[in-house]
């Protein structure tokens, strides 16, 4: 059994230490230890009270996810926690680090809670498709009130110690030795009273909420906005409703237990846990040893002060890394720094940042007009627009002025990293870092490995990704990398559906009902239809079939949100899309001119074609080795492209419906379009053998990766 609980006697106080490194989950051995050691302390007449702490730098991380679905060993969690809650002697939880999920639920079974200043508490189970199943939905509302408890549980965001003290979750904050402070706190309580509070008995805030319909209405609105399509949030709300309405604590616990089981058996739980582990696996590069030496990144530079450059600079500053923002246009530089300051001020205005914290991060950002100022930076990220010649020119300058061991990174969404590194004397230090806009908000970071990028550079950048709180995924250097290459197939099918008879609103609504954050035509309007149109006109290129409708709209000066009309119409100052029936003549004419007879198309066909277009291209990326593993592509699509987390990403989704069924649908679509719908050989092999994408790639199925001189043709 995993984990143990250590026992130490300090005078008349028993100190129990949960020891299950690195984060002390409530594994089977820990549960046995809690029962045994609490019995020992309660049976020792020399013990007056108990301090419960965690070993190392964590209190208790919560349930052991690796035990889910396994045969139960030892007592269940509820039995172990009852031993704490019904302890004859008062218990104080000494929280030394994170107390999340079952960790906080354990602490809520104690009579008192004291924590270090840097500790955090929270109930993040919703992020795994679950609800707090060890009493959290019943105990937390009794301390902070139902409304605040619902916000904590539905957001899944940890609460810092000071805020937790203000809310009443904590009774004290330790500024010295935590265990000694906990013992002193407990001695004081023992001297003051013989009645020590049990959270389960605190009903005042629940009674106050009875009959207040706003509490549940606000929670449902929050869940609908921030957790669209997810199952667990609704179950959390039902649990808190039971806490409010039930006079019997155990009846509320029974409700929580029943609804927890529903979440546990729901397919969303498996999908979201897949993403939880997938993000951790993505950080491991198969041929880069775990002990590879990394460079210290103590300072950074960013070339370009536009939206992307400013967002990247904020990432460094937020992590406490001084950053120089360079732009040789003084007005652009002033504007860019002004936007950064405005972004931070918005956070202050919304209560997400203190003025002192804002001043601190702004002090880490230094504007500059001179390349020489970047000389001592440990890393410089180029963040100018997508033009290979311009980027090569910048990298030549950086190679001349920045110290020789510094990493040079290009924020490119699809250009050849090897072509960029070729102009430097340090190709082993050059890497692609594809941030997603807005870079200070979007979590995804595609790290692009060039032919000569060293293992040390890769290990350093992957570590940096964690420091700046990104979901980092490595891609080989190939056209479109992972995300944008998969996107080609998705948008191609959306455009083909428009030619064949669907309307933008139908396509967008079908895909948003599936769970996508934004439909493809709303996204195209947001980005701007004129970007590709202008580029093609400038280069005198023929318009591809799939862009003919968008280009026809541009000829009518319908560019998207920027001028209030594109696939949709937009009211002044609003981003809300309204139907544009006047466009239908254009759709019909372009379709007829290109030999299409428009027809009725079902929502099911829309979803299948767009999503399976992603999946088939993903299979090709996997067989080429551009992505290391299928879960990496799921991480990319959930964190960068608005794919619903509760479906587990496109590759997991395909596995869940069965690759044999995926292949069957693709073959059916291929009857009308053999070029686009040629199934990946990897998909065919896996489908015919009952396999899943997690089984791939294997050496016998690997193919040569797409080269930059090749075109992705559909």
Regions found by a protein language model. Name each.
Residues 123:
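Small cofactor-carrier domains centered on a conserved lysine used for covalent cofactor attachment
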Residues 2-3, 19, 71-75, 82, ...:
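N-terminal glycine-rich phosphate-binding loop for ADP-containing cofactors
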Residues 5, 47, 60, 296-297:
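A broad structural signal for short, well-ordered beta-strand segments within beta-sheet-rich domains
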Residues 103-106, 110-112:
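Active-site-proximal alpha-helical scaffold in enzymes
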Residues 11-19, 29-71, 82-96, 116-120:
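A structural preference for short, pocket-lining loop segments at secondary-structure junctions
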